[in-house]
From Swiss-Prot:
Annotated GO MF terms: ATP binding; magnesium ion binding; shikimate kinase activity
Full protein name: Shikimate kinase
Record pathway: Metabolic intermediate biosynthesis; chorismate biosynthesis; chorismate from D-erythrose 4-phosphate and phosphoenolpyruvate: step 5/7
EC number: 2.7.1.71
GO annotation terms (biological process): amino acid biosynthetic process; aromatic amino acid family biosynthetic process; chorismate biosynthetic process
Length: 200
C-alpha cells in the first residue's frame, strides 16, 4: 500500500474511532517494557484524546514514586491504591489510559475496564521487554539478581490473564508510529464490528 493510501486509511480509522468510542476509555494493559505509555501517548495524540498513565496518577495522589510506595507499603497496599485510581480514571472518558503491569490482574479492575472501556493487550516477547526495561532503574519487581528470570515468571503468571483483554497487539523493535497506527487499525475494526452487531 502506498504512503498516501496508508495516510488516507489512517485518517478514516481515526475518524471512525472518534465517532464510535463515545465516553469509553481505551485501556492499554501488558507487562512493563511493552510500550504502553509510549504507544498510548502517540495513539492519544492521533485521536486528539487525553492520555493518562495510571502510575503517574498514583504518584501524583500519593506524592511518592511507585518504587517508594512498594517499599513503604508493599505490593498489596499498592495494588489497592492502583485499583482505586483506575476506577476514578475510568469515569473520565473518552481517553487513552496506560495501566501498570499488575493492574489487570485484579478481577475488580478487569470488570470495571470491561464496563467502561476497551482493553488492549500490548504484548512483546522476552528479549524486547528486557532490552527496554534495562534502560530504566525504576522497576521495583526487577530489583534482584535475576531480572530475566523474574520477567519470565511474570510472563507465565500474567499472560493468561492479559489474554482476557478484548484486543491484542504484538509490539516489536519497530517505530512507535508504526505500532500506534496498527493499534488504530485494530481498534477501528473492533468498533465497526461492535456497531454492526448492535445494528443487526
Amino acid at each position: 500500500m502506498s504512503g498516501t493510501n496508508k495516510q488516507t486509511n489512517l485518517h478514516r480509522q481515526t475518524e471512525t474511532i472518534r465517532q464510535l468510542l463515545g465516553s469509553k476509555v481505551v485501556v492499554l494493559v501488558g507487562l512493563m517494557g511493552a510500550g504502553k505509555s509510549t504507544i498510548g501517548r502517540k495513539v492519544a495524540n492521533m485521536l486528539n484524546l487525553p492520555f493518562k498513565d495510571a502510575d503517574t496518577e498514583i504518584e501524583t495522589v500519593s506524592r511518592m514514586t511507585v518504587a517508594e510506595l512498594f517499599e513503604a507499603y508493599g505490593e498489596v497496599e499498592f495494588r489497592d491504591l492502583e485499583r482505586r485510581v483506575i476506577l476514578r480514571l475510568l469515569d473520565d472518558g473518552p481517553m487513552v489510559l496506560a495501566t501498570g503491569g499488575g493492574a489487570y490482574m485484579n478481577a475488580e479492575t478487569r470488570a470495571a475496564i470491561a464496563e467502561a472501556g476497551i482493553s488492549i493487550w500490548i504484548n512483546a516477547d522476552l528479549d524486547v521487554l528486557m532490552e527496554r526495561v534495562s534502560r530504566r532503574q525504576n522497576r521495583p519487581l526487577l530489583r534482584n539478581s535475576d531480572p530475566r528470570g523474574v520477567m519470565q515468571r511474570l510472563m507465565d503468571e500474567r499472560y493468561p490473564v492479559y489474554a482476557l483483554a478484548e484486543l491484542h497487539l504484538m509490539t516489536r523493535d519497530e517505530k512507535k508510529e508504526v505500532i500506534a497506527a496498527e493499534l488504530i487499525e485494530v481498534l477501528a475494526a473492533h468498533l465497526e464490528k461492535e456497531q454492526a452487531a448492535s445494528a443487526g
